Structure formats: structure tokens, C-alpha cells
A protein has these predicted regions:
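Domain-terminus/edge residues, biased toward the C-terminal soluble/receptor-binding domains
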Residues: 120-121, 132-137, 141-243
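Active-site-adjacent loops and short helices of periplasmic peptidoglycan-processing enzymes
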Residues: 1-141, 147-154, 212
Length: 243
């Protein structure tokens, strides 16, 4: 099976790291909001979920997809991670980065160190949200490696597997519901995460994870207009062949 529509894809056995099938998997590409997989992982490894975060004016005004944070709002790190992974809040990504590392630049350094540690040889991060930058790229293979690694983190798993979550602004006590924009988790048997992304330049990007019969498969698609159908086709095939 080879979804012709994808710029690149990589299907990986999460347990062994074996590449089941791929297309252009080692080509450097733009990744859009799938960046936030690394943002969430670095945050989870470096700060407690209960940490409280006060939102700045700059963060509240971030361009692109948003969880609509307002300056002065206070949230737990956990709720910001939910907003970042479920509705792809760029505002949340910046607030998380500043809180965890002191500044966006310091956080990005942590992202790149982690990428090296995992063995992501064709990846460089320039920001925590994935908006376009010349210096911000990955490959389908590298992202699949990252997803396999991240899904070993129980908190990460729980967050990206949420179909929806109630988040609470702590000064007002006001709660809102965040519904996961990653439709793949509703559509594919065994699907349990991870993240979608889209910019005009990167196209539609999807990192998907699914578990069946004790096996976990990761599927990464970059620049694929038919992302959900392609992922379903590739993962079905992978599970069939791994029986």
C-alpha cells in the first residue's frame, strides 16, 4: 500500500523501531504543529503537571491555532498541555516553553538536545509551536522515532488519547471544554493519539499511534491532503502483516 498523496510517510513498529514501510522518510520536511509532540515531551520530562502558569500579553496574542488564552489567565501546566495537544494552541506552546525553561530560546535548546538523544538526525527545532521557519524541519522517520519514544511516557499517552478535556482558569474558576481535533482517534480501531498539524507550506501532517493485540504501530504522514484515509490504509496493512 502506498498512498500516492503523501509527500512522505513512515510506519514504524513502536516496540522494535523497525520501519514497516516508508516513502521519502529521510527527507527533511516542514512539520507544522506535530512539533508540539516534542514540546509536550520536554515539558513533561522537566516540570510537574501541577505547576501554575500566568499567561503574558505576548503569549495571548500568538498567531495561528489557539486555545484563546488571555493575558493574566492562570492555568496548570497540565491544562496548557491539554490545550496545546487537543486544539493545538500556539499560545499554550509559548507559555509552556517560557514556564519550563525560562525563555523560548532555552526551551528550544532542550528540544534540540532531546532530538539528538533520541537519534533524530534530520531534525532541527526553531520554536515550540511549528509555525514556519527555515531552521525548523524534521523527517517522517525522525518524527516516528519521537512518537514511539513519547508514547512510552504515561502522562503523554493520557493527554494525547483524550477525546475531550475540561480545563479550568484558576483565578475565575471558569471551565471550558477542549475537544480533540485529531479525528483519527475516533475513526480507527485501536487509535490512541497523537497529533495533527497544518500550515499552507507544510500541508496536512499527522502523527498517529494505534495499538492492537499488544502491538503498537506509529504512522507519520507529512504533506498529505488525504491524511486520515492514508493513515488508516497504512496502519491496517501494517497490523495485517505483523500478525
Amino acid at each position: 500500500a502506498s498512498p500516492a498523496t503523501a509527500g512522505a510517510y513512515c510506519v514504524m513498529d513502536a516496540q522494535t523501531g523497525e520501519v514497516i514501510c516508508q516513502k521519502n522518510a529521510y527527507t527533511r520536511m516542514e512539520m507544522a504543529s506535530t512539533t508540539k509532540v516534542m514540546t509536550a515531551l520536554v515539558a513533561l520530562e522537566n516540570a510537574p503537571l501541577s505547576l501554575t502558569v500566568r499567561i503574558t500579553r505576548a503569549e495571548a496574542g500568538t498567531e495561528g491555532s489557539s486555545m484563546y488564552l488571555r493575558a493574566g489567565d492562570v492555568y496548570t501546566l497540565e491544562d496548557l498541555l491539554l490545550g496545546m495537544m487537543l486544539v493545538s494552541g500556539n499560545d499554550a506552546a509559548l507559555a509552556v516553553a517560557r514556564t519550563v525553561a525560562g525563555s523560548e530560546a532555552s526551551f528550544v535548546r532542550l528540544m534540540n538536545e532531546k532530538a539528538q538523544e533520541i537519534g533524530m538526525c534530520d531534525t532541527h527545532f526553531d520554536n515550540p509551536h511549528g509555525l514556519h521557519s527555515q531552521e525548523h524541519y524534521t523527517s517522517a522517520y525522525d518524527l516516528a522515532l519521537l512518537c514511539g519514544y513519547a508514547m512510552q511516557n504515561a502522562e503523554f499517552c493520557r493527554i494525547v488519547g483524550c477525546k475531550s478535556a475540561d480545563i479550568k482558569e484558576l483565578t475565575s474558576g471558569e471551565t471550558r471544554v477542549m475537544v480533540n481535533k485529531n479525528r483519527f482517534i475516533y475513526a480507527f480501531e485501536g487509535a490512541d493519539g497523537i497529533k495533527i498539524g497544518y500550515t499552507r507550506r507544510a500541508g496536512r501532517c499527522l502523527c498517529a499511534s494505534a495499538g492492537r493485540d499488544g502491538k503498537r504501530m506509529i504512522c507519520v504522514l507529512l504533506n498529505d491532503a488525504d491524511w486520515f484515509a492514508s493513515a488508516a490504509e497504512l496502519l491496517e496493512e501494517a497490523f495485517k502483516n505483523k500478525r
